[in-house]
A protein has these predicted regions:
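RNA pseudouridine synthases
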Residues: 1-300
Length: 300
């Protein structure tokens, strides 16, 4: 059993407990609700329900049970493992591979491959459906992803992400010629009120900060490096589209007619850096841009 403690602040007053947990940890809201239902969330000695309203002064204790026997079908999916030890795995995910099972994608995901590779040696923080997953990248985004092999490693890695101490750099090809050599996009992101499948810049969304540097200009296109300060769903895609420079090939936020006949956005998680949860060593990994991405650049 792993224990996580979160101190509420005045700004959290009135928030539902399950949302508060999800916003302040790497635990998903649905799993937070289940932990409440199962009696694993407390304030002092009192068990709390998911609909409990935060007062703004309390300390919330979350007891995360050890992994259940995984119900995910192990699948022998080839994994491009960049690094692995007893605590973490760094995997280079190809475009088109979902990170975890979801309706319509119950198998053939990165998690199915991880369960085959690791057995039950994956953290349980994110529940049975997302064992080991510390953070996610979209199905059609390629690149580096951190996986935790135990709860202690997961909590420490999640804390680094929350405190903005982990480094995540992406490379993207965007539409249009960005005039500035660098910039910062600081716009809150939340669900699109008119399309729940999409995210959008919304005034009451969660804080989202993306830094970008221009790497090369190609007339109608710009190659950029994007550095995440926060990690909201679709953050880079939404932010770049919000300044008029959507990612080439993006089916949700891009232009409708692309001339390159792509299967998804040209967005690659190129570099990731973090402090090892056990040794304290600073680790950094880099992944080359995939071939299909390079092929487009050669045509420009």
């Amino acid at each position: 059993m792993q224990t996580l403690k979160i101190n509420a602040a005045e700004k959290n007053k009135g928030e539902r407990l399950d949302k508060f947990i999800a916003d302040n940890s790497d635990i998903s809201r649905s799993y937070a609700a289940k932990l409440c239902e199962d009696g694993f969330v407390l304030c002092g000695e009192k068990q709390l329900l998911k609909k409990y309203k935060i007062l703004g002064t309390e300390e919330i204790t979350i007891n995360v049970p050890e992994p259940e026997e995984l119900s995910i079908e192990p699948e022998n999916i080839p994994l491009n493992i960049v690094y692995e030890d007893s605590d973490v795995i760094v995997v280079n995910k190809p475009q088109g591979l979902c990170v975890h099972p979801a309706p319509g994608n119950e198998s053939g995901t990165l998690v199915n491959g991880l369960v085959y590779h690791c057995g039950d040696e994956l953290s349980a923080i994110n529940g049975v459906i997302r064992p080991g997953i510390v953070h996610r990248i979209d199905k059609d985004t390629s690149g580096l992803l951190i996986v935790a092999k135990n709860n202690e490693a997961h909590l420490k890695l999640s804390e680094q992400l929350k405190e903005r101490k982990a480094m995540r750099k992406y490379v993207a090809l965007v539409n249009g010629n960005i005039k500035e050599d660098s910039g910062t996009i600081n716009k809150p992101i939340g669900r699109n009120p008119s399309d729940r499948k999409k995210m959008a810049v919304v005034f009451d969304g969660r804080e989202a900060v993306t830094h970008f540097n221009v790497l090369e200009r190609f007339g109608q296109y710009t190659l950029v490096e994007c550095i995440l300060e926060t990690g909201r769903t679709h953050q880079i895609r939404v932010h770049m589209a919000s300044i008029g420079h959507s990612i080439v090939g993006d089916p949700l936020y891009g232009i409708k007619k692309e001339k390159f006949n792509l299967n998804g956005q040209l967005l690659h998680a190129k570099t990731i850096g973090f402090v090892h949860p056990r040794t304290g060593e600073m680790m950094e990994f880099t992944s080359d841009i995939p071939e299909y991405f390079e092929n487009v650049l050669e045509k420009l």
